[in-house]
C-alpha cells in the first residue's frame, strides 16, 4: 500500500505514479480481454455495443479500418469482463485510491478504457475531470492503470503539477460543453507539462482538478489505459453520470458515513454527450446541442 510520502506527494503535486501495482498475471488477464475487443473491432465501421444508457460501449477513431484497427474507448468494461471488474472493485488500485481520498470511504464512480493503438490519431485536449463529474466536494481520484507499457513517445498522459490547487476552468465554448479549456487558458497555464509513464501494471493517480492532456500515438507500440474514477463516499454527484454503470456507487474502501460533505466550487453543469465518448465532444462533432 502507499506510504505517507506518496500520499503527501499526491496532495502537493496533484498526481502520483506507482509502479507494479498489479501482478503480471492480473495485467495479462486485462490485456487478453482487450485484445479480443480489438479483434472484434475489425468487423465494425462505427461504434457498437450497448450500455445501460443506450449509447455504444465501443468507440473507434475516424482512421479505423479492418487492417488498422483504432479502438479508442471501451465504456464500463467492468460490466463485460470479470478481470476488469475485479481490478476496479477489489484490487490494490481501489485500495490506494481510498488511501488518497481519505475520510470514511470511497466509491467507484465510473470506469473506461482509453486506448491509443499504434499510429492512431487519438488525442485529448487540455481539461480537468471535475467539470465532467461535479460533486458536492472534489475528493475524486482518477486512476489510470497502464495495461501496456507507457513511454514518453507513445502518447502518455501529460499533467501540470499543482494545477489542482488553482482555478476550476470553464469547459464551455460557444455555448457548448466541449470538454476542454479555452485556448488562452492553455497558452497561459499548460506550457510546461510533465509526462506520466511506466511499465505495464503501473498506475497514475490523478486529482480530479488537475489539468491534463495527451497527444496521438505515433509509435509502433500501443498505449492502453484502464481508467477508474473513485469519489469520497460523502461526495454527492451533481447532474448525470456521463458513463453510468451497474457498478456505479459501489463502496470499494472504508465504510458509509451517512453524511454529505460540501466544499465551495462554482461551475456550469456539463452537457452529457449523445455520442459514444467524449472524444466526439472534444472534436465538436457531438449532436448534443443541435
PLM-predicted stretches and their roles:
Residues 129-131, 140, 208, 213-217:
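Glycine-rich phosphate/pyrophosphate-binding beta-alpha loops
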